[in-house]
Amino acid sequence: MNAHATPTPAHEIDPTGATPVMAQFFEMKARQPDALIFFRMGDFYELFFDDAYKAAAALGISQTFRGTHNGQPIPMAGVPQHAAEAYLSKLIRLGFKVAVCEQMEDPAEAKKRGSKAVVRRDIVRVVTPGTLTEDGLLDARGANRLAAVALRAGQAAVASVELSTGEVEVLAVAKEGVAPILAALAPSETLVADRLLSDDSLSQTLRICGGLVQPMPSALSEPQASETRVKRLYGVETLDGFGGLSPAEIGALGLIAAHLEMTQAGRLPALRAPRRAADADVMAIDPATRSSLEIDRTQSGDRNGSLLAAIDRTVTAGGARMLASRLARPLLDVAAIDQRLDAVEWFVEHRQLRQRLREVLKGAGDMARALSRLALGRGGPRDLGCIRDTLKVGERLAGMAGGAPDPLSPPPFELEHAFKALTPALHEGLSQFLTTLEHGLGPDLPALARDGGFVAAGVRPELDQARGLRDDSRKVIAALESQLALESGVPLKIRHNGVLGYFVEATAGKADPLFQPPLNATFIHRQTLANQVRFTTVELADLDARIAQAAERALAMEVAAFEDWREQARLLADAIQIASEALARIDVASSLAEWAEDAGAVRPVVDASYAFDAKAARHPVVEAAVKRAGEPYTPNDCRLDASGETAARLSIVTGPNMAGKSTFLRQNALLAILAQSGCYVPAASFRLGVVDRLFSRVGAGDDLARGRSTFMMEMVETASILTQAGPRSLVILDEIGRGTATYDGLAIAWACAEALHDTNRCRALFATHYHELATLETRMAFVSNLSLRAKEWNGDLVFLHEAAPGPADRSYGVQVAKLAGVPAPVVVRAREVLDRLESKDQSPAKLDDLPLFAVSQAVAVTSAPAKAAPSAVETSLADLDVDGMSPREALEALYRLKGLLTA
């Protein structure tokens, strides 16, 4: 067998005859056949058989062989325990599932059962993308959600859990509403009953925005089984307290409960009660729109360059995640939006207090994730320290808010509620727990409880005594070393290792007296090496035992203290989670106020109208980039009204390439997202009637996997818009029809514009190079024209980036080609062809249909003239017998034909 041999799956290998350790491995593999088994052996996690091949290839580590099974070498690979997180992270990103099998006892404990006893091992967790909790495996500023989709009686539901913070949400949606909800949640892993994967539309949705899709046995989503699991997860007798969940909602939550039972090995996370929502509560943004607008990631997957990166001034991890969540799901409820805006405005008005609060906030840790790790048994003293320090930050913030500079301007509802939640005095148990941690935790906290040294001195007298013996052992050992050297007259040292414990060591050349009477009665020989000889004494052995026992007792007492405090944290989980959320709310509101001040943003007016009225608005991302380059940004106005009362509902946007049409479209879509997320907007003023659905058709690419061209993808997205947009929707369309023949494209664009105006009756911006669409302004009641201006100056094209009423006079495509560096001869030839085409287009005949069809007629007349009589040359050519001519006759015929042409 060699490293490149095709591996046989471990669960297909006959375990008969396995050694006790390998028998343990086979047992674990049988329990998790589709996972890589991280099998703990000492300081390493080992992988065997096909797991070893897979891990070695994925991680770039060595694959070797160790021992044999049924006469064949056992493939093996391993990673050190101290670096396991990095390897786990890579495997999870590559789509693997990993079962972590830990040693459940110390090898010394196993030996007590017999010299051949094997250390007990068990799977303590199964690591999947949606169940990560370690800081090293997570993005501190981003959520890591596990989602589940269920369908029941025509109703769909999406449930999600953020295991690292305990947040749970369940949303009842129509089947077609699953895609925008999943796109907003952006789960790392999505659970779905296997029978649903036969649904093509749902499978496509999961492929686009479901992260790793994990099929689950359909029986797990059945109502009765799901209800039982959800009750067990929350430790309740009935689900009535969660507000009358529908069968689909229970099914989705049941899938999550089943997955957590399997992956967490019986440890229940500290989950909050499910927060119920519906697709009617948030703005629907489909995956294509979300991608094109680059809300939290650019289309290349980077955070930098996104809307979120442009406005994020949060100073806590929880605040960063909350801001991202708000941008992902803008609200529809005007009152709720105003509550968020009130909080931002209060911080805008109280600048000095805001700055002081933000400085204090920087001391807050990620308390929600620390609590989750503690509840799952993965936390350590540092997590307790995080809770202690963050609760202290909350206390300080609550006290500072009480000293607001203007007593006539108390915090608005959202902030008042948050500040109260941060006052431990309002929760006696939380206040006592904070006091316990302040007095009980020492200054230097290890990551793991088993490392010890984290309980403060003076807290537990018996611990101090054990520590005293352990820590004073150096002095005692040094004194004994001096005494033995003096009594023996031999230079010696007392040393320690894990095998012999404490021992006396002398060089081989000086050790002979220790073997002779009377010293041999004191010094008991233990080991001889090449250059040293090792001994022990009765006194040293006794001291060794007492020191070891003291260290063990000290560590055991510290671990017991940790477990006590961990349990207290678990019992106070609700109060800690509420405090954590309150900190995040304060961070988000203050950070948005900070950004508003930096960006010159204003409070939007969001109401129940159908208006969209932006004055001197700017694109937040582009403006930031332009400012960094030291250049001015040109703001623009945009007015739309679906009702047609104050403005047109459809604006046709024309202008040259590179003039900024796409930026203008995206800018206005982002204004709506910001406003309904509860953010200020970069504009002189902005009024928005609530947008229920946002659609963007800006840019497209091939979907090679499904055999779809760019134009096909464009039409699919356009069809989605035309079938779903309503009067409260906002639609931005860019260059519809450009991916096909000119007349086909124009016809499609024209028909789409008519449908948006007459059927969908929504607010829409329609950017196009089909200037013929500008005539729609005179044909339809609620259509206007806007153009992004440019001018020619000394033969060069200057972009003004200014949106002005009226259509553009031309597209300036040849000038843009020149700016792009197209070779000069090509540009000159393009100008010649353009001039010729434009001269042919000057047909006086105009039709009442598409204006370009008048051009079509003119071209048709030019390209298909009436059939004329044959010329003399044609008649002569027709009479030639080409096959029967000699070379000389052919040459004479050519001269004769030439003469006819010149005659």
UniProtKB/Swiss-Prot annotation:
GO terms for cellular component: cytosol. NCBIfam families: mutS1, PRK05399.1. One of its GO terms (molecular function) is mismatched DNA binding. This protein is involved in the repair of mismatches in DNA. It is possible that it carries out the mismatch recognition step. This protein has a weak ATPase activity. It comes from the Bacteria. ATP binds at residues 655-662. This is DNA mismatch repair protein MutS.
